Regions:
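Bacterial N-terminal signal peptides that target proteins for export
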Residues: 1-14
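C-terminal motif of bacterial Sec signal peptides marking the signal peptidase cleavage site
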Residues: 21-24
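Amphipathic alpha-helical repeat scaffolds of TPR domains
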Residues: 33-44, 74-101, 125, 129-235, ...
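Alpha-helical segment of the N-proximal tetratricopeptide repeat
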Residues: 35-61
Length: 281
């Protein structure tokens, strides 16, 4: 090989190596690994696959620092964690009813009820923690840039069967759980965008990919979600008055931070009455 050929080969190898390095660091393949943009893309991909646990992990990595995605990731995290808490509560409530209906074998239903409530509590606590961080920001309007969730808002048939005390086969149970959780996430998103129990409206609102919601409306929606999530800790369920009070207090504080409306006034009255009732136990 001539000296010129050797130099040419060396330069070619250097160019290839440089290209590979650029490709692995981002380039045409997408955002560089470890950046907020990388985790934002990952959150979208895992959300589309209904891997909600991984989606939350990606969002938590984003919200760990202040960056261009933080505000959007935090509101998505609120919608997602509140929705999952709702989904697991629905599962727990259905199996609790099943334990009462199935007198010959209530133990299995009670175990499921307990396990679902443990999961509901985990996501409820993640929700209230994320909300505390959100309240430190003063974004107005609030950015909502998450994709419209897949799934259906229709009641899951298998839950009706479980509520009646019918034992679900494993082939029925796992798909039913996924549908219930997807439904919870869908309804959580509807609540966040101000389209409670109205998926078509929520889908239309989220179509732009960069919805801006007045802070008053979003905080009011979160107050509702906080109060709903707190029901997990009432005397009929987990029976933890301290945690119940935390959720109710957060909801009341949220309502105090926005201008009073007929909706906020009614919700404040409802929460206050609920707290007084709890104090009697």
């Amino acid at each position: 090989m001539t000296h010129t050929s050797a130099i040419r080969c060396t330069l070619t190898g250097m160019l290839v190596s440089t290209s590979l390095m650029l490709y692995s660091c981002g380039g045409d393949s997408g955002p560089r690994e470890g950046t907020p943009a990388f985790y934002w893309t990952g959150a979208k991909e895992t959300f589309a696959a209904r891997d909600y646990t991984k989606t939350i992990e990606n969002l938590e990595r984003i919200t760990a620092t202040e960056n261009e995605y933080t505000a959007r990731a935090r509101t998505w995290q609120l919608a997602l964690t509140s929705g999952l808490a709702r989904g697991y509560q629905d599962l727990a409530d259905s199996f609790e009813a099943g334990a009462r209906a199935n007198r010959s074998n209530p133990a299995a239903f009670r175990r499921s009820t307990h396990n679902y409530r443990v999961e509901a509590s985990r996501y409820a606590l993640e929700f209230v923690e994320a909300y505390d961080k959100f309240q430190k920001s003063k974004d107005d309007p609030v950015p909502l840039a998450f994709p419209f969730p897949t799934g259906s808002a229709a009641p899951v048939v298998e839950l009706t069967k479980a509520s009646a005390g019918m034992v679900l086969a494993q082939g029925e149970l796992e798909p039913a759980e996924k549908r219930v959780l997807s439904r919870g996430v869908l309804l959580g998103a509807c609540n966040a965008v101000g389209a409670t129990d109205d998926p078509p409206k929520a889908q239309e609102l989220l179509k732009s990919g960069n919805l801006q919601v007045p802070r008053t409306a979003f905080v009011t929606a979160m107050a509702n979600a906080l109060f709903d999530a707190g029901q997990l800790y009432n005397t009929r369920k987990i029976d933890n008055p301290d945690k119940y009070k935390i959720f109710c207090d957060r909801a009341l504080d949220a309502l105090k931070s926005v201008p009073e409306t007929k909706e906020t006034k009614e919700l404040t009255k409802k929460i206050t009455a609920s707290l007084k009732k709890t104090d009697r136990y």
